């Protein structure tokens, strides 16, 4: 029984998910259905949390829109997500960046992770 569940989960998992973590800036292309039409909507922001649970993996992206903080949680392997693109790698020392909710301006900046040779 356990093997059947594992096989079904592996079958539904996406293989084109890039490697990213907390502190990275990502652009998530989300499929949005409006009436009969379906279009892609981009959501760009900072990953403040990532949850690795196989098929049930999720991540939370935060952005500032018109001076207001907006957070959106995505299921990593959801069919509504068309693509995830990593724009910038951030250097952080925490797995969850919830403390950024109280910060704004320069204090909410994240250092960039430089590529190692």
Curated annotation (Swiss-Prot):
The keyword Transcription regulation is assigned to this record: no
Source taxon at top rank: Bacteria
GO biological process, one term: translation
Family matches, as InterPro entries: Ribosomal_bL19, Ribosomal_bL19_CS, Ribosomal_bL19_sf, Translation_prot_SH3-like_sf
Keyword Ribonucleoprotein carried by entry: yes
Free-text function comment from the UniProt entry: This protein is located at the 30S-50S ribosomal subunit interface and may play a role in the structure and function of the aminoacyl-tRNA binding site.
Protein name, as recorded: Large ribosomal subunit protein bL19
Organism (species): Shewanella frigidimarina (strain NCIMB 400)
């Amino acid at each position: 029984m356990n093997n059947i569940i594992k096989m079904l989960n592996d079958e539904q998992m996406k293989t084109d998910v890039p490697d990213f973590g907390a502190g990275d800036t990502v652009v998530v292309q989300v499929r949005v259905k409006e009436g009969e039409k379906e279009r892609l909507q981009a959501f760009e922001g900072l990953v403040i949390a990532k949850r690795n649970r196989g098929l049930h993996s999720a991540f939370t992206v935060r952005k500032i829109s018109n001076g207001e903080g907006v957070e959106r949680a995505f299921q990593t392997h959801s069919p509504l997500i068309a693509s995830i693109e990593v724009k910038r790698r951030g250097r952080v020392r925490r797995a969850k960046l919830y403390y950024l909710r109280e910060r704004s301006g320069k204090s909410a900046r994240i250092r960039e992770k430089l590529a190692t040779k």
